[in-house]
Amino acid sequence: MSNQDPAARRSTLRTEALRVADDVLFPAAAGVDRTGVVPSSHWRALADAGLYGIAAPVEAGGPGLEFGEVTEILEVLVSGCLSTAFTWLQHHGVVISLSRTPNRSLRDELLEPTVTGRLRAGVAYAGVVPSPPRMTATRTDDGWVFTGHAPFVSGWGTVDLLQISARDTETDDVIAAILPTAELPTAELPTAVRASPVELTAAAATSTVSLQVDGLPVPDARVVSRVSIDEFFTNQNVGVRLNGTLPFGLVRRCTALLDVAGRAPAARRLRERADEARMALDSAMDDATALSAARADAARLALEAVAALVAARGGEALLRGSDAERLFREASFILVAASRPELKDLLVRRFAGEPDSR
């Protein structure tokens, strides 16, 4: 695929994403939900289709997609299988970090294998979001020591690399490092990383754990970035938009199933509303407050789309393992997963019928 001209390569990636979502992921989604396991064939299908490197620039071996092309592919994959896509989505943040890092040796070591999907990556940055932070970094002579808690880390046991972020105890800067998961000290040692499985009601196959980190040594050679806390939160707007693809992926699947159920007018209107919500989200990229509001609108739309599907399917939607039943649980996951406190507060106010705070 890399030998194609750029326009053809972009078109091929979109076509491949649709094929993987509809022919590989969605037919297996009920089984993934039932067993709590994403089959290894899903990861191979994504890698073979070139979908691990969609966020990489051309100079890093990527396709050089426009941002809207990246988000469309993310939506498409979410419409196939939420557990697979949510785990895979985390990978792109690591690819972006590696493509921008001043740490040339780390980039040379890891960028190419992450772009191709030969190495799969996850992230643990939620520990730096609250104040005081849950995850801290203390400077040593040749690196850092990370200590703290990361409450939700997906892909445990399936990813090869983990980008973990912590806040410097002296400057409050955010330090991000990429560590091979196979080398993390997980035994009961003074410098252990302990993983406790988190039992989720939806997307359980994401293999999500809670990490307790006690004195983890992080050499400078593994540090991918160091930014101020203000710069970190500014950069989070991109992450909010990428995670904003989750509700649109759910709407895509619900509308397709509404078409099958003979409810084409309802499906058409939901697609129109999704287009409007997507435009609002894209136009708010430079305004964190407006971005949260648009993300809340998208999450609410996903819930309404799956409610329409449940109503259309009737009693069948009450059967454990039906598409509508699974998607309804996944809508609750999408309401709160990968979201900031202000988004949750906004959703509470909107569902309660309270006015937005000014």
What residue spans do the PLM features occupy?
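A glycine-rich, basic-preceded beta-loop-alpha segment at the flavin cofactor/substrate interface
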Residues: Q212-L242, T255-P265, R278, D282
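Short, structured patches in soluble enzyme cores that scaffold and shape functional sites
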Residues: Y125-G127, R139, A150, S165-D168, ...
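Glycine-rich flavin
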Residues: V37-D48, Y52-S154, T158
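Glycine-rich phosphate/cofactor-binding loops in nucleotide/flavin-utilizing enzymes
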Residues: E316-R358
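A short core secondary-structure module
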Residues: F152-V193
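Flexible, small-/acidic-enriched active-site or ligand-binding loops
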Residues: T186-P217, S228-E231
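Actinobacteria-biased recognition of intrinsically disordered, low-complexity terminal regions
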Residues: M1-R19, G353-R358
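Extended amphipathic alpha-helical segments enriched in small hydrophobics
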Residues: L242-E304
